[in-house]
Amino acid sequence: MKKIGNGIKDKLSVIILSYALDDDIYNLNKQAIESLLASETWPSGRLQILLIESNKENPYQYPYPNVDVLIPNEKFGFHRFFNIGIEHTDGEYIAFCNNDIIFHKGWFSAIREVADNRQRFLCFSPIDDSGNYPKMTPEALPRDKAYYRGWEHQKHFAPWCFVWKREVFDITGPFDETVDFYGADCDEQNMMSRNALWSVVCTKSVVNHLAGQTAIVKQSGKGDKYRITDYDKYPLTEFEKTHNYPLWIYDDYRFYEGYQKLKKKWGLDNTNKWLQRKITQYPILNFRPLTRLLFTKRMNHIFCRLRGIKP
């Protein structure tokens, strides 16, 4: 990916991934778009919506302002389509979104307020206030603070909707297209932590996730089609079974393969999360030359040995 710079100032580009196989998914897309349009009073030219459709025979139209539908010739890849979206948009801010979400009033203004007051922050997430995510409840994230920083999954980082400034990709490079839907969120967390980019969750910004309603999730873990039954073929160490991976990955071998691919790239996920917590606890450690050294597979193996864990 070429150097992409900062984009048009104050403009938000929203990239929504869709696989509209039926009217249910189409209506889900419409609900997301309509809630987005109603969530703010958008100044002219300051909102761009790009829906990237995987159904190459897509029969659906979206009669809304600022909405473009792109049907790539390429085979679907979660990160591949996000990279295509980056190339086809021009906003200073880019929101990477599932289609099973509902935007609440003022969600982007709340992110902008934090971004304007803390210009060193480049990566943001809204909260989900439905109660479905325990780490985002008022008890876990008291609302008396406008933001919290860290990299914890479904706490500081909401993979269903996250907003990064365009300049992030001049620091990190593009999304890794060898990483697909299965495990992409862990790869994105490591992208941020390796490059000393805090993931900042904004407590006044609300985007609720209607979990499990996308086409790709509906087809995952159903019946025996993807379920792992040969455990010798898909082994986990005892440590991984108890500390590293949720055992529901056995419901779908594609999740297993995705996490194993990340293990080859980043090392043991549990140790990376341990390191992310340490840096969150001691933020003086969060500077780029150090984090780029720490978040490597070689250092991951060293930390594993120091922790008494077999990598």
Mark where each language-model region is.
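Short, well-formed alpha-helical segments that are part of the catalytic scaffolds
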Residues: 21-40
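Short beta-strand/loop segment that forms part of the nucleotide-sugar
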Residues: 44-56, 70-72
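Glycine-rich, basic loop-to-helix element that forms the pyrophosphate-binding segment
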Residues: 72-89
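Short aromatic/hydrophobic "clamp" motif used to bind/position activated sugar donors
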Residues: 94
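Conserved donor NDP-sugar-binding/catalytic core segment of glycosyltransferases
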Residues: 102-139
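A recurrent flexible, glycine/aromatic-enriched loop bordering the glycosyltransferase active site
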Residues: 145-164
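A short, conserved alpha-helix in the catalytic core of glycosyltransferases
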Residues: 161-162, 168-172, 178-206
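Active-site-adjacent helix/loop segment of glycosyltransferases
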Residues: 190-311
